[in-house]
Amino acid sequence: MVKRKGASSSEEGWNYEAKVAEIEGIITRIEAGELELEAVFEQFASAVEYLRQCESFLQQRQQQVDLLIETLSEE
């Protein structure tokens, strides 16, 4: 199995759906105006990091799918 890049994404228990839910929660709080300006910046930075982790995860899965499709084509 391929390891995920990034410190947070390689930890045990990392979950794509959970990160997407966290990103959605951050967006909701920012849009609702529930946060002070400093917290907005902190939450935005967290959301960007989660998005990077998710993108890396999806890229790795796409590579795995491409490899599987390639092996099917060879058979």
Curated annotation (Swiss-Prot):
A Pfam cross-reference name: Exonuc_VII_S
Superkingdom of this protein's organism: Bacteria
Gene Ontology CC terms: cytoplasm; exodeoxyribonuclease VII complex
Function: Bidirectionally degrades single-stranded DNA into large acid-insoluble oligonucleotides, which are then degraded further into small acid-soluble oligonucleotides.
Broad enzyme group: hydrolase
Catalytic activity, as annotated: Exonucleolytic cleavage in either 5'- to 3'- or 3'- to 5'-direction to yield nucleoside 5'-phosphates
Subcellular location: Cytoplasm
The protein's name in its UniProt record: Exodeoxyribonuclease 7 small subunit
Hydrolase in keyword set: yes
Main location: cytoplasm
Xref: InterPro entries: Exonuc_VII_S, Exonuc_VII_ssu_sf
Organism: Nostoc punctiforme (strain ATCC 29133 / PCC 73102)
One GO biological process term: DNA catabolic process
Enzyme Commission number(s) of this protein: 3.1.11.6
Molecular function terms, GO-annotated: exodeoxyribonuclease VII activity
Keyword list, A-Z: Cytoplasm, Exonuclease, Hydrolase, Nuclease
Subunit structure: Heterooligomer composed of large and small subunits.
Family to which the UniProt record says this protein belongs: Belongs to the XseB family.
